Amino acid sequence: MKLLDIDFVLTVDRTLMTDHHGKEFIGFMTTAPPVFFPEKLWMWIAAPKPKVDEYGRPVVAPYGLRKVEASLLEKGFKVAVIDPDYLEPYLERVKAVMIGHHDYFAFCPPSSEWWMLTGREPVNRRYLLRLMRLIARVKKTRNPDLKVIVAGPAAWQWLYVPDYVDEFMVDCIVEGESGEKAIPWLAQRILDGEELPRYLYVGPADSPSVEEIPVIKGLSVNGLIEVSRGCPRGCKFCSVTLRPFRHIPLDKIEAELRLHAEHGVHDGILHAEDVLLYGAVGVNVNPDAVLKLHALTKKYYKSFGWSHAALATVVQAQRRFKLISRLADMIFDEHMDFLGFQTGIETGSPRLVERDMRGKAAPYTPREWPDIVEEAFSILHEHNMIPAATLIIGLPGETEDDVYKTIELVERLKPYRSMIIPLFFVPMGAFRRKDWFLSIQLREEHAELLRICLLHSIRWAKEIIGKYMPGLRYAPVRWAMRLFLAWAEYGARRATAETILGFVEQAKERMARQEAREPLVKRIKARISGVFGRQPVEVPARAT
C-alpha cells in the first residue's frame, strides 16, 4: 500500500466507516450486539467495508470527519481520512490521529437500550475498543510522540471513563463544535511542539458562523449533507439546543450536492435537527426556504430522506401552508416514492412535556401534545412519509399515569406507518460506574410499553423493508432482515410484561458477571487535569 505524506490522520471504527449498503437506517444495527446471527454476518449486513483508494482513503466517510478534513485542508494542513483497516502504517509516522464518534462507548441510545436488554456489548463499542487498542499499541511501541485526539458528538463519554483515557493514551478530549476552530488550533499547536490541553470545551460562544463552516472536499456516507445546525426548541434533556441555530446557505449546500452528483451519487440525506425549519427564525416555518431547499436537492438527487423533523413542525407546515402536500408533489416521482426520517415523541404525558420539553410542542401547547403527535402521524401516513420515532422511558419524576398516557398514545398510532423505539433515560452520572445498568429500574407498565412498541414496529417494518430495500441488489440483506423480524415477532407475541421484566433482570445479571470477570484496571495515579471539572477552555476566535 502506498502512503501519503501527511501529518494528521482522521479515522473512526468500522461501524461508522461504512455506507451501510447505501441505506443509512441499516446503520442502527451497529448499535446492537449480534442477535440471531454471528458477528461477522451481522457486520456484513450493518457495516460492510467501503471502497478505498491506493492510499487507504475511503471513497465515502462520515460527514463529521469530512467537515474536519475540509477545515484542516483549507488552513493548509496535510491531512487525510483513512480507513481503519489501513491505519496502522500511518500511525507509525503521522504526528496525530484524530477520532470522531457518535457513541464511543455505547452510552447513547439506542446502544444503551440494546446493551441493557440483551446484557451483551454492542458492536459499535466492540469495534471502537479494538481501534483504540491498536492506536495505543502503536503509540507505545513505535511512535511515542503520536498525539491522540478524541472529539465529536460523543466526546463527553470519555469524561466518564478515565481508565480508558489512561489505557488508550489519549492526549486531548475535545467537547463541543470543534471541527472549524478547535481542531485546527490543536493541529497548529502540535506542529509547533506546544503542549495540548487534556480537555478542551468549545462552548456556544465559540461555535462557528455559517461563513466559517467549510464545504466538504470528499464524499460523505450515503450522500448526507448538512442544511442547518442547532435547534430552537430547548428540551431539557438535549444538548443540541445549547448550540446557536444556523442555516447553511443554499450555495454551500449546492456545492456539496454537486460534488456528490459529479461522482455518481444521486441518493442522499438532508441533515438538520428539523429539516422543515430550514430558513426559519425560531419555530416558525419558512415555506419558501423549505421549498427552495427541496427543489435544489431534487435537481441533483433522484431520491433522498431527512435526518430529523419535528412532529409539531409537520402539523404547523401542513395546517398553515399545506407544505407537506406541496413537498410530496415536488419530490415524489418514479425514482422516489417515500421519505423516511427520525423524530421524537418522547412521551404521551402532557405533564412531562410541560415540565421538560415545552418547546417540543411549539407553536402549540403541551396540553395538545398527544393530539399533535397523532395528527402529524396521520399527515405523514397520507403522504407516504415514514417517521422512526423515539420515546423516553424513566424520565425523572415519571409516574405510572405518565407511562399509561404514553401507552394510550402508542395505541392511537397503530394505523400509521411508522417505527416507534423506546429509549431508557440513564442519569449521566451513572456512567461513572461500571454497574451503570443498575440505575435503570423498569416497572410493569414500562414492560408493557416496550411490548406494544415492539409489536407496532415489527408490523410496519415488514412492509417498510420492501420499500426501503427494493430490487435484486438488496435481496440478501432483505432476506436476512426479514428472518430477523420473524424471529423477533415470534418472541414479542409470546412475551408478557412479566417475562420482559424477567428478561431484563437476567440481562443485568449477565452484565454484572461480565464485569466481575474482567481484570481490574489500575487506578488512575493522578486525576486528569480538567476532566472532572468540565471547565471551558477558551478557544481563539480565529485559529491560525
List each model region and its residues.
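Conserved SAM/AdoMet-binding glycine-rich loop
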Residues: 10, 259-387, 393-395
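Flexible glycine/acidic-rich beta-alpha junction loops that bind and position SAM and/or redox cofactors
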Residues: 105-111, 271-282, 315, 345-358, ...
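N-terminal [4Fe-4S]-dependent radical SAM core
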Residues: 20-23, 57, 185-225, 267
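Catalytic cores of alpha/beta
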Residues: 159-168, 323-324, 396-412
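A solvent-exposed, charged loop/short amphipathic helix patch at secondary-structure junctions
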Residues: 24-55, 104-131, 356-365, 445-455
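Glycine-rich beta-alpha loop elements in corrinoid/cobalamin-binding modules
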Residues: 64, 80-210
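N-terminal pre-triad scaffold of radical SAM enzymes
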Residues: 5-8, 206-241, 254, 258-262, ...
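Radical SAM enzyme core and accessory elements
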Residues: 1-33, 78, 231, 455-544
